């Protein structure tokens, strides 16, 4: 299943926690290419969204794609 991320919420939470893209890659285990794509509005798997959400400590799924 593919989902879309709430980019604004994701980027705001990254800023709030002072987590940059590289750190998000390290903490989540998600590839740099995927993190960049998600930050730019591309959809991702539910599994990927869950990994990113776990690091950020909040739900960031906007909708199923």
Named regions from a protein language model:
Residues 1-26, 61:
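A short, Lys/Arg-rich alpha-helix, primarily the initiator
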Residues 6, 44-45:
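Residue-level preference for nonpolar/small residues embedded in alpha-helices
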Residues 27, 38, 65:
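Residue-level "edge-of-site" marker
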Residues 30-43:
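Recognition helix of helix-turn-helix/homeodomain-like DNA-binding domains
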Residues 47-62:
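DNA major-groove recognition helix of helix-turn-helix/homeodomain DNA-binding modules
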């Amino acid at each position: 299943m593919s989902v879309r991320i709430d980019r604004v919420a994701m980027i705001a939470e990254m800023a709030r926690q002072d987590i940059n893209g590289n750190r998000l890659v390290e903490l989540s285990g998600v590839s740099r290419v995927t993190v960049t794509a998600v930050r730019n509005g591309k959809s991702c798997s539910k599994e990927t969204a869950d990994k990113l959400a776990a690091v950020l400590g909040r739900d960031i799924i906007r909708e199923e794609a």
